[in-house]
Structure formats: structure tokens, C-alpha cells
Swiss-Prot record:
Top-level division of the source organism's lineage: Eukaryota
Official protein name in the record: Probable divalent-cation tolerance protein cutA homolog
Family that this chain belongs to: Belongs to the CutA family.
Annotated source species: Encephalitozoon cuniculi (strain GB-M1)
A Pfam family assignment: CutA1
Lineage: Eukaryota, Fungi, Fungi incertae sedis, Microsporidia, Unikaryonidae
Gene Ontology molecular function: copper ion binding
GO terms for biological process, alphabetical: response to metal ion
The protein's assembly and partners: Homotrimer.
């Protein structure tokens, strides 16, 4: 049985988070992505940094985490992007069925008509 998973990635701009979200859904690596504005405080290069970031949460399955990680690592503007995942322990049957209908374990983008 597929394990539902939520992948979290932070971005410096809303635009970069939206671009990645669209690509993850287009590639069928995620059923849906949500973007929220957040304030992050972290230690980076010997300094404490406080800045506005945009958190992308991708709804997917654990089997697709590696594909998402590879995509993000290859396209992200940060030197060390946050790419974390958490298993969803509870979700409605209908939501899981919908998620399953939206993703593709091969990670291949669907053929689209022009």
C-alpha cells in the first residue's frame, strides 16, 4: 500500500515556489502543492538570519520522495535547500484515492495536447 507523504521545501520568493509547484504537479510527482508565506529564523554562515520565505507543501506518496528531492536539488536557488518529508498517518479514503489518481510512480510527465 502506498504511504501518503507531505514534502516541505522553502523558497526565497513566491514565484520560485509557484514555478516548482507547477512543475511537480505537471510531472505528476505531487497531487497538489500549497504555498504559505512564513518567517524563518536560522543559523547560516556564522550568523542568525531572519527572513520571509515561502513554504511549499507537496502532497504525494513516499515512493515519489526521491524524485521530488532530485528535481528540487537540481532547480532550487538555495545552496542548501530544505527538503523534508513527513508521513501522513491519517487521511480520508476519498482524498487518498484522488491523490493516487493524480500521481505517477514513474515520475513521467503526462502527454499533453497543444
Amino acid at each position: 500500500m502506498k504511504r501518503p507523504f507531505a514534502v516541505s521545501v522553502t523558497y526565497p520568493t513566491r514565484e520560485s515556489a509557484e514555478e516548482s509547484s507547477c512543475e511537480l504537479v505537471r510531472r505528476r510527482l505531487a497531487a497538489c502543492c500549497q504555498i504559505s508565506e512564513i518567517t524563518s529564523i536560522y543559523f547560516w554562515k556564522e550568523a542568525i538570519v531572519k527572513e520571509t520565505e515561502y513554504k511549499l507543501i507537496a502532497k504525494t506518496f513516499s515512493s515519489l520522495f526521491a524524485g521530488i528531492q532530485e528535481f528540487v536539488a537540481g532547480s532550487h536557488p538555495y545552496e542548501v535547500p530544505e527538503i523534508t518529508g513527513m508521513e501522513m498517518h491519517l487521511a480520508s479514503r476519498q482524498y487518498l484515492e484522488w491523490m493516487n489518481s493524480c500521481v505517477d510512480d514513474t515520475g513521467q510527465a503526462p502527454n499533453t495536447r497543444q
